[in-house]
Amino acid sequence: MIFKNKSKLILIIGGILVYLASAGISYGAFRFLGSGSSLLSPVDITPGSGFKIDPNAPKTEACPLTGQLFTKAEKQIWEKRRPLTVMIENHADSRPQSGLSKADVVYEAVAEGGITRFLAVFYCNASEEVTVGPVRSARTYFMDFASEYGDYPLYAHVGGANVPGPANALGQIGDYGWLDKGNDMNQFSIGFPTYWRDYERIGHAVATEHTMYSTTEKLWEVASKRGLNATDEEGNKWNAKFTEWKFKDDEKLEARGTTSKIDFSFWNNNPDYAVTWEYNKDQNQYLRVNGGQPLKDLNSDSQIQVKTVIIQFMKEKGPIDEVKHILYTTTGTGNALIFQDGKAIEGTWAKEKRQSRTKFTDGSGKEISLNRGPIWIEIVPSGQKANY
């Protein structure tokens, strides 16, 4: 091709050079952002900025959910979003799950047939992107627990119970205003790439129901696009009605107790779902054993460990319909056991209504201060025993 117009030729060549330069810059930028950076939200909450937390920075900022201390940079992250709750399954074939070690609070209860399920609450301890799953379906009583984290907590799940009557979780999501508000994070309405299936996640093929995955950052990104950050589009703060628990520091080593093991079952004769928490006195942590095996997080290959284990004994009803759904009486009062510092505290739980914070009190009626750090709450049917 021969160009007779030199000005035109110069413009074309200049355009090509600008394109190549910008492409090179973009390529370099994307390589930088993707080169091992498991970032989640940076301080300025710009996804993909490559921001990482300095592990040596002072930890001075208390998480409102657990009292655990984090850096100022991490606080800048969580202050710009709202808690994310995720339904994660615990079928024996789904283990090890992903993300549980990064949850601030985990609730565990039977979903059906003696098989338990988790509601994992992510907020302060997920400043870096956390892969979560397998994600499973909604249950009404887990929504009662999620409701403690604001009127419109982010609730991630894959479908849910959809039957006439009190177990109608999908119907209740609409009744609570979660569909209209947009805090319902149902995979059925969001889909790929926020959610995806991984059939080889644990090194071998598993049934389809054990394959749904997401990440905390992908879910928070969807929420942000819907105007649900720390405040909503009307300026309402997620924590305007949120009640914090009371927290305390660990007991000194010499003051710690000798309760070294906690054993219980949700249902009898169901060994795959029997739970043991083993106390490490030096670390002042409780390590989880499930079905006789250490329960690990697939992301890190580390055993699940928490600072406080709470057993809430709760009235179980059901099966209440032909598809064997069960319910728990999540409001009112009941007995509780609180394990921390190697000690067992016999107490009481109380919750006034769905959106109320569950409170834990000792025998004198005083609210129990919980150790700073991850908390695991076990919803065990009334009448079951815990050995310790």
Residue ranges and their predicted role:
Residues 2-3, 10, 40-105, 112-388:
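A surface/extracellular/periplasmic glyco- and lipid-processing/surface-interacting theme
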Residues 3-5, 28:
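Short alpha-helical segments used as structural interaction elements across diverse proteins
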Residues 7, 11, 31-34:
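Short hydrophobic helices that act as membrane-entry/anchoring signals
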Residues 12-27:
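Hydrophobic membrane-insertion alpha-helices, especially the h-region
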Residues 23-38:
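Membrane-interface motif at the C-terminal end of an N-terminal transmembrane signal
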